[in-house]
Amino acid sequence: MAKHASGKNNYRLSGELIALLVVLALIAAAVIWWLSSRGDDAGSTEAKAEECVAGELVLPVAASDKGAGQSLVDAYGDSAPVVRDYCVKPQLVDSVADAAVFVAPNTAVTHQSLESAGRTPAVSDPKAAYSEAVGVAGKDEVKLEDLTVDKVRFPVSEESAASALVASQVAGNDNDAVQALTDQRIGSADELNADGGEYLATAEDAVPEGLKFTPVGADAVYTAFPLNQNDKVDENQARAGQDFARFASERFDGTANDQPAVSDLVWAAALPAGGEAIT
């Protein structure tokens, strides 16, 4: 008996097979990608471990302004620095005597402070590394022509540089600035009587909540001073301190000229211990 055509697609089975093969190929590709990504993560972890064959190294950083110092510490730490096969872990410390880096304005008073602490810079030309606008904070903004120095309070223990710059800018002469820094210093921003019309000398980044900031046309510029080793800072930490200073200065997009000239008498009067601490 002769066979007759059924009218069905003779390639139906081949089409289903192709679809199945495509699905299998996609699954295989996904598995390969997953395994590859796991391998990359493992490889980067292993590479990091190989870079840090010497382990971790704590880098102590002191700063005349905690906000400026912490900003630089955070930025350097986020870069995952490796120095001499150590994974460097920067942290802020209170004492210059314990530090491998000192962050402070590059002034004669700062150099005298280092000398008094028995520390010496590891480089002859330390670079500017950070800046912040300074001004006053109060219940309301104030016009500079209406701002007199007797209305300003200076939290020298927390913000020495801002206090010096604001006093110099607002007082207009060194004698009045020194007198204000001596007589109108406060222990902290909490002591400010904003409702009584007082204004706080502060960096813009440190304005207390609820107060309004008015700039006085000056920036505080901080230099990262890498320090030589001593009995508390070893050679590896000193070398890491130099890397910290290099990193900070390369990221800094301002100049030392952003900070107006302020006399040494005013800088000294803005120290927490007052001008008598520096001779």
Question: Language-model segments: what does each one mean?
Answer:
Residues 167-226:
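Ligand-binding pocket segment of bilobal, Venus flytrap-like solute-binding proteins
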